[in-house]
């Protein structure tokens, strides 16, 4: 059941991301494609689902409120587009 919910969540996040990328092909300040910036997050999410993890390990990418860190780690912003599990 948890894997099914995670896959559905992945599909919802991916579709929202595709819509955001269609609306804004480039970031306003750097010109970098959003697709390039989001690839590591989706890779981390897919690996977590495949391994059956319920949480993300230390120093791995996370998504606040969607892909949480293992206790006692916290999902913190490390730069303007990435969040990592720090603790």
From Swiss-Prot:
Removed propeptide positions: 21-52
Assigned keywords, A-Z: Antimicrobial, Disulfide bond, Knottin, Pyrrolidone carboxylic acid, Sensory transduction, Signal, Taste, Taste-modifying protein
Outcome of substituting residue 80 to A: Attenuates sweet taste-response suppression properties
Location of Pyrrolidone carboxylic acid modifications: 53
InterPro entries assigned: Gurmarin/antifun_pep (IPR009101)
Signal peptide: 1-20
Disulfide bonds: 55-70, 62-75, 69-85
Transmembrane regions listed in the UniProt entry: none
General remark: Named after the term 'gurmar', meaning 'sugar destroyer' in Hindi, for its sweet taste-suppressing properties. While Gurmarin has little effect on the human sweet taste-response the Gymnema sylvestre plant also produces gymnemic acid, a mix of triterpinoid saponins, which blocks the sweet taste-response in humans and chimpnazees, but not in other mammals. Gymnema sylvestre has been used in Ayurvedic medicine for the treatment of diabetes and other illnesses.
Name this polypeptide is given: Pro-gurmarin
Organism: Gymnema sylvestre (Gurmar)
Phylogenetic lineage: Eukaryota, Viridiplantae, Streptophyta, Embryophyta, Tracheophyta
């Amino acid at each position: 059941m948890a894997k099914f919910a995670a896959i559905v969540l992945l599909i919802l996040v991916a579709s929202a991301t595709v819509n955001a990328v269609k609306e804004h092909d480039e970031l306003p300040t750097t010109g970098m494609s959003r697709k390039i910036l989001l690839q590591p997050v989706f890779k981390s999410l897919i690996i977590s689902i495949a391994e059956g993890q319920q949480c993300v390990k230390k120093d791995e990418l996370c998504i606040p409120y969607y892909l949480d860190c293992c206790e006692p780690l916290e999902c913190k912003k490390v730069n303007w587009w990435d969040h990592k599990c720090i603790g």
